[in-house]
A protein has these predicted regions:
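Hydrophobic beta-strand scaffold residues
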Residues: 27, 48, 113-115, 156, ...
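Helical "substrate-binding/catalytic lid" subdomain
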Residues: 164-224
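Rossmann-fold NAD(P) dinucleotide-binding segment
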Residues: 52-112
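NAD(P)+-binding Rossmann beta1-loop-alpha1 motif at the extreme N-terminus of oxidoreductases
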Residues: 1-64, 87, 93, 123
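Rossmann-fold dinucleotide-binding core
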Residues: 4, 94-177
Length: 224
């Protein structure tokens, strides 16, 4: 089993780290707000730390799932100082492709592997361990990290070199935006036509209009 660290215990990161622990990996966690770390430790087997550097010390593989480019940069800069040589840094944050390329170069200079690996599937996918991962990086690094990521991901694809994972996530978001726009217009039409929305969804969700967004978002969209 791998010695891992997971940085960022939000709605996605907490269950992802939990699946790593459940799979038997040695998991160290860090979160900026310590209450989330304590809550995670009460529910899972693992160790909590008060700094990124301490959590990542001697790790074989470090995962981050944080807020934005700046957060990723700060986490990487701290982690690379204490990770063992030859270890891998996997960034699950939805961030920029430019940052991914920059960190891949820095990782290589530090003797580390790097993957930009944004995810899709939402909180439900994270909790079920069924996320989709689109990765950018070296094939050898992906091959080493993939079995560990299987703890929380059902579908993993190496898209191409560093930055490719983030670009693929952009494609994913563009497609989702189109689906959401169509779903919003359809729900608006059904409301104006005074149809029973639940019956409409029950019918069309079994046909060609079915989508993950319809299944998981229609009710909150109707409620506003």
């Amino acid at each position: 089993m791998a010695k891992t660290a997971f940085i960022g215990l939000g709605v996605m990161g907490a269950p992802m780290a939990g699946h790593l622990a459940a799979a038997g990996h040695d998991v160290a966690v860090y979160n900026r707000s310590e209450d989330k770390s304590r809550d995670w430790a009460q529910r899972h087997k693992g160790r909590t730390y008060s700094s990124v550097a301490n959590a990542c010390e001697g790790a074989d593989i470090v995962f981050s799932c944080v807020g934005n480019d700046r957060d990723v940069h700060e986490v990487f800069d701290a982690a690379c100082k204490t990770m063992r040589k030859g270890a891998i840094f996997v960034d699950h944050t939805t961030a920029s492709a430019a940052l991914a390329r920059e960190l891949a170069e820095k990782a290589e200079a530090c003797g580390l592997g790097f993957l930009d690996a944004p995810v899709s599937g939402g909180q439900a996918g994270a909790e079920a361990g069924k996320l989709t991962v689109m990765a950018g990086g070296e094939p050898s690094v992906f091959a080493e990290a993939e079995p560990i990521m299987r703890a929380y991901a059902a579908n993993l694809t190496l898209i191409g070199p560093a930055g490719s994972g983030q670009l693929a996530k952009m494609v994913n978001q563009i497609c989702i935006a189109g689906v959401l726009q169509g779903l919003a217009e359809g729900l608006h039409f059904a409301t104006r036509a005074e149809l029973d929305i639940e019956k409409v969804i029950a019918a069309i969700s079994k046909g060609a209009a079915q989508s993950w967004q319809m299944e998981n978002r229609w009710q909150t969209m109707v409620e506003g």
